[in-house]
């Protein structure tokens, strides 16, 4: 049985708050991908300027409310499985799913919240 299923696995939620820098561009890659159960999946968003690690990552499944996964680049929110992790390399911020499970097929969003200087 082919367990490969297409999944929209990354998107962006760009919100602005008073005092937040609105001139920062966020670029996603890939915009979507297909993956098999058990695979390691990496999703990246790139900031056009330094956001000092101020990045949150979210997950949304069809028909469900959005769920907060990771704050400040790499800190897991309470109850988030350990197969999820976040990392940073320069201006690239990644969400990594160590071993994809069926419940992980969803849309994923990043939110930068860097403060103004």
Swiss-Prot record:
A GO term from the CC aspect: immunoglobulin complex
Domain of life the protein comes from: Eukaryota
First and last residue of the signal peptide: 1-22
Alphabetical UniProt keywords: Adaptive immunity, Disulfide bond, Immunity, Immunoglobulin, Signal
Stretch list, region Framework-1: 23-45
Region (Complementarity-determining-1): 46-56
Segments for region (Framework-2): 57-71
Disulfide partners: 45-110
Region named Framework-3: 79-110
Chain residue ranges for the region called Complementarity-determining-3: 111-117
GO terms classed as biological process: adaptive immune response; immune response
Region (Complementarity-determining-2): 72-78
Family annotation (Gene3D superfamilies): Immunoglobulins
The protein, known as: Immunoglobulin kappa variable 9-129
Source organism of the structure: Mus musculus (Mouse)
Record lineage: Eukaryota, Metazoa, Chordata, Craniata, Vertebrata
